[in-house]
Structure formats: structure tokens, C-alpha cells
Amino acid sequence: MSQFNQNNKQIDVMGIRKILPHRYPFALLDKIVDWSVEDRTIVAQKNVTINEDFFNGHFPDFPVMPGVLIVEAMAQATAILGELMAETLFAHVVEKAGGGRRTFMLAGIDKVRVKRPVVPGDVLVIESRMVKQKNIICTAESVAKVDGQIVCSAELMAAYKDY
């Protein structure tokens, strides 16, 4: 991921598409607002609109973003952080990849708390921090906020795997 410069902290949706394999309807992030390999942190953004497919059934008269999709957006932000850190943290694994494609895949979710609904018009801001790494597994603490208030928090585990 050396193509992403530490001096330019923002990554647009086209840059996100270069990092993550996710595509519609599961590409859930619109922008990376800030990131730091040194601090092991990332801040991502999801603009929640009424046009999201999941609002057709969740719930038609009271549209609420499903908690599992909030957690998925948190996992995607964490995966991007992992990819941006891969050349330093996972150099031994990257070298063994043999030219194949690797990405971070969700391996575990702990301590999830959904504190309030996320609705159309909200801007979901996700903050993740890598707290532990062993071999190909990393653990991150992540929160999702709307208007500065935490709407969801979780501890996420991801594995750096071939796909």
C-alpha cells in the first residue's frame, strides 16, 4: 500500500476500492478521513442515505441501519488500516504471498454494544485502533459515532489471508 502517502491522510472511495475487495452492496465506506501507521489508527466515514437497499426491509416505516452493518463498516475500516500497515507489521507474511492477493478477513467480534439507532441523514464516523498483532491475526478496538456520540463499539479480530 505504498501508493498511499502518509502526508495525504484522506483516501476517497476510488482509493478504498483499490484496497478492499468489497463491492456494492457491501462496500460500506465513503472516505478515509485520517490514518496513521505510527499511531495504528484510522478514521473512516459512511454517509447514510435513504437510498441504502437495507432500508427497504429494516424497517420500512422506521428506517434503521442494521447493527451488523455498522459492525461490518467498522471491520472494513479496520481492514483498510491493516492493509496500510501490512508492509511494516506483516512484512514476513507479505513476502510469502507469492504474488497472490491477500486481505484482512474478519476472524472474531467481541464486546459489541449498539447504543442508538443510525438513520438516513446520519454521517457515521468510524475510529479504529490496532491494539494487538500476533502472526497473521490482529485485534482492533473500534467505535462508530454520529455527531460525536458513540452509536456502536466493538473489539474486532482479523486475519491476513489469501483470497
Swiss-Prot record:
Keywords: Cytoplasm, Lipid A biosynthesis, Lipid biosynthesis, Lipid metabolism, Lyase. The gene is fabZ. The active site is at H58. Its main location: cytoplasm. NCBIfam families: fabZ, PRK00006.1. It catalyses: a (3R)-hydroxyacyl-[ACP] = a (2E)-enoyl-[ACP] + H2O. One of its GO terms (biological process) is fatty acid biosynthetic process. Involved in unsaturated fatty acids biosynthesis. Catalyzes the dehydration of short chain beta-hydroxyacyl-ACPs and long chain saturated and unsaturated beta-hydroxyacyl-ACPs. It is found in: Cytoplasm. The keyword Transferase does not apply. It comes from Francisella tularensis subsp. tularensis (strain SCHU S4 / Schu 4). PANTHER family: 3-HYDROXYACYL-[ACYL-CARRIER-PROTEIN] DEHYDRATASE. GO terms for cellular component: cytoplasm; membrane. The keyword Chaperone does not apply. This is 3-hydroxyacyl-[acyl-carrier-protein] dehydratase FabZ. It holds the Pfam family FabA. InterPro entries: FabA_FabZ, FabZ, HotDog_dom_sf. Belongs to the thioester dehydratase family. FabZ subfamily. One of its GO terms (molecular function) is (3R)-hydroxyacyl-[acyl-carrier-protein] dehydratase activity.
